[in-house]
Amino acid sequence: GTGRFWYVLTENPKRHVYACDNSQKMIDIGLQYREKQLTKKIDTFKASAFSLPLSDGYVDNIFCIRLLHHIGYSEDRLKLLKEFHRVSKSTVIVSLWVDGNVKAWKRKKLESNRTKRHYQNRFVIPQRTIEKEFNEAGFTIKAYLDFIPKYAMWRTYILEKNENISC
């Protein structure tokens, strides 16, 4: 992305941050509009999150915000999560849209009234579905946080790598 969370991620001076996006243009925007003091703390690279050019267990944590709700097919989300399992040593933090709240209900109602489009790029994922996928990819849910409980679709999960599973 464009570095929206880089400030938070670099608060700890001992933390080394790698930022990755499938679009070099997005990375360049982040580098252009953030202070040099910040960007010098971050190594950026262009890559697909489905195939990261990193060795197994290369990073302590993966912070993946505002990506999963763009992936409509379970098999694609599972592939992504398995790649995160491979590359992370311990934890993964992800955010996405989930059901079970007012906004998801309103969105479903809105979508049912729309003319069907060939392409859709944002999805409300059922909680039960995504949590099953986390498990299949080798993660245990350590915690989750709803942005505004029972109202907003945004949920952030902290996933812990289950060492008994090799993906």
Task: List the model feature ranges, each with a label.
Residues 1-51, 75, 79, 93-167:
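Class I (Rossmann-like) S-adenosyl-L-methionine-dependent methyltransferase catalytic domain
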Residues 63:
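A conserved beta-strand element that flanks and buttresses the S-adenosyl-L-methionine
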Residues 66-70:
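Short catalytic micro-motifs in class I SAM-dependent methyltransferases
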Residues 88-92:
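Short glycine-dipeptide loop
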